Amino acid sequence: QVIQSLENNEVDFSLVSIMPTTLRVDHMDLLQNKLFLVGNMEREFKHGPYGKSLLSQLPLIFREKGSGTRQVMESFLKKQNVPVIRKLELTSNEAVKQAVRAGLGYSIMPLIGLRNELLNKQLQIIPMKGLPIKTTWRLIWLSGKKHSPVAKAFLSYLKKERARIIENTFRWFEEYE
């Protein structure tokens, strides 16, 4: 859906963790993306890191087909070569997060959207061998696109201020490896 909006020229930019293969795009690397196995606080996971057998015991919640998060999660699960319990498929990271909070299952999710829930002890990171998965958040746009003055100013601002924004806003990322 994100890529389709870009392709249809409905948006100037898209934020992705996996580069599209069907479009010619330019990009700017923004921030490391770390994906962890997360669950609510009902069950304790103190004796990790856990091996792949844990994955076959947990009901898993997936993003929709085409989602970068889903692609990364499925690739990881395929490498683990264990059967999994597919509980739900939802259309946004926020929906997945709320389902996990409600105790409907577990998921492999990007750290970027979990800060408040981790601080408030509504979610926990489950230590797992092979995690976190690390990718890169990238801002992409169609190659050769003629940007509006506002879009040009936005790109210029990001190029100039990227390091400062990361330092001031995402320093907490470093706590999680």
Walk through the language-model features, giving the residues of each.
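Well-formed, non-transmembrane alpha-helical positions, independent of function
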Residues: 4-5, 29, 53-54, 76, ...
